[in-house]
Curated annotation (Swiss-Prot):
Keyword vocabulary terms for this entry: Ribonucleoprotein, Ribosomal protein, RNA-binding, rRNA-binding, tRNA-binding
GO molecular function terms attached to this record: rRNA binding; structural constituent of ribosome; tRNA binding
Keyword tRNA processing among record annotations: no
Family stated for the protein in its record: Belongs to the universal ribosomal protein uL16 family.
Organism annotation: Desulfitobacterium hafniense (strain DSM 10664 / DCB-2)
Protein's UniProt name: Large ribosomal subunit protein uL16
Amino acid sequence: MLVPTRVKHRKQHRGRMHGKATRGNVITFGEYGLVAMEPAWITNRQIEAARIAMTRYIKRGGKVWIKIFPDKPITAKPAETRMGSGKGSPEYWVAVVKPGRVMFELAGVPEEIAKEALRLAMHKLPVKCKIVRREELEGGDANEN
């Protein structure tokens, strides 16, 4: 499970998700990618489920890169607790994903296998996604600065 080893502050504000992703919106490592089409919080369990689905399908070949990390703590109060008495304790971690963010990358497998593996991962995530090739994303060359 992906969780930060140390954090400066245990609790965070929820924040807002405005606009499109300005970073992490190009394929840098792999040949195929899974791009988010809408904003969402993606939990560490969802990321892990998508990773397992992809790696099981591609079996031994290929390499998978996870481009998002759950670094935002989400707090929750116990059920049937009265209002007040402070903020709840951290329950799980999420990655904040904006539209256009490349979440997973895949390389070293044929196109049909890559697309099917990413499609399986798509079903594990709470966002609409699209599968893209490196050439389809503008500025998709890893050597561009």
